[in-house]
Regions:
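TPR/TPR-like (Sel1-like) alpha-helical repeat modules
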Residues: 16, 49, 78-84, 109-130, ...
Length: 139
């Protein structure tokens, strides 16, 4: 119920604003409604190409999650690799991207690579908003 209502409100906001800024949240609502393929459709839409870099990262994280929902861990990894994976990035969106990538690698059984990317996530998350260090200890 709530996902459906949220999606309707987001669609209305998108119509009023005329821009793509709500795509990542809309895609996440589609996932919440059990429609991961719709989330991926939104990530592939023409509007998605208009997003700023940070919003593209958020949409890629959602699309990767949708691929994982469908059992496609390798597809999730590839989805995240479409973003700027430069280790020198320092914004919180980089920490979230690196974390999502590390998590997908861990699920795929690629533990050494997962450790490397959880470390990178922790390095650009000085406020420890994410649990990257704890995930490192678990691996």
């Amino acid at each position: 119920g709530e996902w459906k209502e949220a999606l309707a409100e987001l669609r209305a906001a998108r119509r009023m604003s005329g821009g793509p800024c709500m795509l990542a949240v809309m895609a996440d609502c589609e996932r919440g409604l059990g429609r991961p393929e719709k989330a991926i459709e939104l990530a592939r839409s023409e509007e998605a190409a208009q997003l700023d870099a940070e919003s593209k990262v958020e949409l890629a994280i959602v699309a990767a999650g949708a691929r994982r929902d469908m059992g496609d861990v390798d597809g999730a990894i590839v989805e995240l690799e479409t973003q700027n994976m430069e280790a020198k990035r320092s914004e919180i969106s980089a920490a979230r991207l690196f974390y999502a990538y590390a998590d997908a690698l861990a699920v795929a059984g690629r533990k050494d690579e997962a450790r490397e990317w959880f470390t990178r996530s922790a390095d650009v998350d000085p406020d420890e908003l994410l649990d990257s260090r704890e995930r490192l200890e678990e691996l």
